[in-house]
Amino acid sequence: MKLDIFAGQEKSELSMIEVARAILEERGRDNEVYFSDLVNDIQTFLGKSDADIRQALPFFYTDLNTDGSFIPLGDNKWGLRSWYAIDEIDEEIITLEDEEDGAPKRKKKRVNAFMDGDEDAIDYSDDDPEDEDFTEETSDVEYDEEDPDDEKSEVESYDSELNEIIPEDDIEEVEINEEDDEDDEEEE
């Protein structure tokens, strides 16, 4: 293989990524290359041994992915990003994904491993009708509406309970002097 772009340069000084770019440019847009074929072409051009290529392969693949001038086209095919307009790149990728989808996948039926066809077995995943008996419905609960007469009877019952504890005769009358309270606030 001969690449005119590298005429007069020492092959040992060339990187695999530079050679890959030159190979793809020479082949042209309609000739995307499988990764393995690209690596074989690079090995042939540079004249490197299999051991040298195997050692450099992880770094080359990383460079191929991180270098912005290459684009994966699916099925491990590679091309140059400059071959495609930005909108066209999305379309290429989408059409490749659509082709891979093929027939729609059938959903698997869920099977309970503990239900081995025994009709008498209890299926605990179903809602039990007994559970509904324990719930209270809010429509059955009646709330007391406020009635002023009820409040009076509550106050009277409270007072009568207090009188049982402390009879009224034992309660001392305390005078509240509001003027004293105002003076205390002014002093502070």
Swiss-Prot record:
GO molecular function: DNA-directed RNA polymerase activity
Organism encoding this protein: Streptococcus uberis (strain ATCC BAA-854 / 0140J)
GO-annotated biological processes: DNA-templated transcription; regulation of DNA-templated transcription
Region (Disordered): 117-188
Lineage: Bacteria, Bacillati, Bacillota, Bacilli, Lactobacillales
Entries under PROSITE patterns matching the protein: HTH_HARE
Protein name: Probable DNA-directed RNA polymerase subunit delta
Keywords: DNA-directed RNA polymerase, Nucleotidyltransferase, Transcription, Transferase
Claim: Disulfide bond is one of the keywords in the record: no
Xref: InterPro entries: Asxl_HARE-HTH, RNAP_delta_N_dom_sf, RpoE
Quaternary structure and interacting proteins, as annotated: RNAP is composed of a core of 2 alpha, a beta and a beta' subunits. The core is associated with a delta subunit and one of several sigma factors.
One GO cellular component term noted in the UniProt record for this chain: DNA-directed RNA polymerase complex
Family: Belongs to the RpoE family.
Classification via HAMAP family: RNApol_bact_RpoE
Biological role: Participates in both the initiation and recycling phases of transcription. In the presence of the delta subunit, RNAP displays an increased specificity of transcription, a decreased affinity for nucleic acids, and an increased efficiency of RNA synthesis because of enhanced recycling.
Pfam families: HARE-HTH
The HTH HARE-type domain, residue ranges: 14-83
UniProt keyword Transcription present: yes
